Amino acid sequence: QATYHANRMPPLILIALLFLMGFEKAKPTKPISFAVTSTIEVNAPPEIVWQNVVSFSELPPVEDWLFKTGLAYPIRAKINGTGVGAIRHCEFSTGPFVEPITVWNEPSHLRFSVTSMPQPMQEWTFYKHIEPAHLDGYFQTTQGEFRLESIHDGKTRLQGTTWYQNDLAPAHYWKVWSDFLIHRIHLRVLKHVKHLSENQSN
């Protein structure tokens, strides 16, 4: 069962408003940093789970209605090299995240910085290849990590964390929405890693 460190969200209609409203730019101050952590239990040992965290095959088509609104969602991940300095690419529906590895403690801790990220969502428009200014620079992912903990009966507690900066005002209001959306992205990846690992372990 996956867990998330946040309260439940308001009804569907309030969530939909996020995509109908324009983002509000904060005053020119230093963006505030936040972290979101999600956890899932995997019925496989860390040595197997690790391999599916570092890189993973293409995820199944999205079923979550939220991603069908245009929100960027993960598709696959690949890595060039091993150890600190290797470059991981996490492909999203709007483009790749470029993630240089900063911590490589196999099979328990993988951390990476983010040097490039795609747009957070695909704008609803009749025109292709449009990059609206109101999507640029308001939300930046700065780093991420996976922690794998061996627990009872050969299982693994898998924890994913994303650090991000929010340049929207009011920051703590938008944090609620941002955390919710990041958690949904986490769960898409964590559930896929769980599925792959448990199939390999059986």
What are the language-model segments listed below?
Residues 18-23, 158-162, 166:
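N-proximal short alpha-helices
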Residues 132-133, 163-185:
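A short acidic/glycine-rich loop-to-helix N-cap element
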Residues 42, 137, 182, 186:
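Aromatic-acidic/polar surface patches that form glycan- and anion
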Residues 1, 53, 88, 160-164:
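Long, contiguous hydrophobic alpha-helical segments, chiefly transmembrane helices and signal peptides
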Residues 11-12, 41, 70-153, 157, ...:
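Glycine-rich portal/gate segments that line the openings of hydrophobic small-molecule binding cavities
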Residues 3-84, 91-98, 103:
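Hydrophobic ligand-binding cavity/cleft-lining segments
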Residues 159, 175-187, 191-194, 201-202:
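Soluble extramembrane regions of membrane proteins in the secretory/endomembrane system
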